[in-house]
């Protein structure tokens, strides 16, 4: 749940109406640390499954494995967008949405693993009551974040124009490919 800090900076920037480079500058190291630890966790889990357990593969596309991959992909897109938003001042709305969804996907992964909703060799501590509590927390936080974006997002200025063939255009294409 390391994406909580970029999410919190995003919400604070929306609340204050200060959607400048400051919140992205403060968010980027935290997003990088969270994404880095998630990368290490996924790599170590894959190594462990292959060598120690002898499952014969690095990745089995198990629902719980995918629950860790989704915030990793959203975090990767967030890191790229934070850099461009900080340096060029573009993609503010996109970056805010990525911060919300990266955190939401990490909470969704917690819900899937802990609730017993899915059947997996990786799911543990399946407790419907705990799952309901996590789902309510997920709904409040993500719903509140999206509501804040809807109420305060109008403060976003019109982004500067950029060329069709530019770094910004390729970043948008890159982020769309990552998220698909």
List the predicted regions and their residue ranges.
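Polytopic transmembrane helical bundles with strong interfacial aromatic enrichment
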Residues: 1-180
């Amino acid at each position: 749940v390391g994406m909580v800090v970029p999410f919190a900076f995003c919400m604070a920037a929306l609340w204050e109406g200060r959607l400048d480079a400051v919140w992205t500058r403060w968010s980027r190291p935290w997003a990088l640390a969270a994404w880095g630890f998630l990368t290490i966790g996924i790599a170590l889990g894959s190594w462990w499954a292959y060598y120690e357990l002898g499952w014969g593969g690095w990745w089995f596309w198990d629902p719980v494995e995918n629950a860790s991959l989704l915030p990793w992909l959203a975090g990767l897109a967030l890191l790229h967008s934070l850099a461009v938003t900080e340096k060029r001042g573009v993609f503010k709305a996109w970056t805010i949405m990525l911060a919300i969804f990266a955190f939401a996907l990490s909470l969704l992964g917690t819900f899937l693993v802990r609730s017993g909703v899915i059947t997996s060799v990786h799911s543990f501590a399946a407790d419907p009551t705990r799952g309901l509590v996590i789902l309510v927390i997920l709904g409040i936080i993500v719903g509140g974040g999206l509501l804040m974006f809807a109420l305060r997002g109008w403060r976003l200025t019109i982004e500067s124009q950029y060329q069709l063939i530019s770094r910004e255009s390729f970043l948008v294409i890159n982020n769309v490919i990552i998220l698909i």
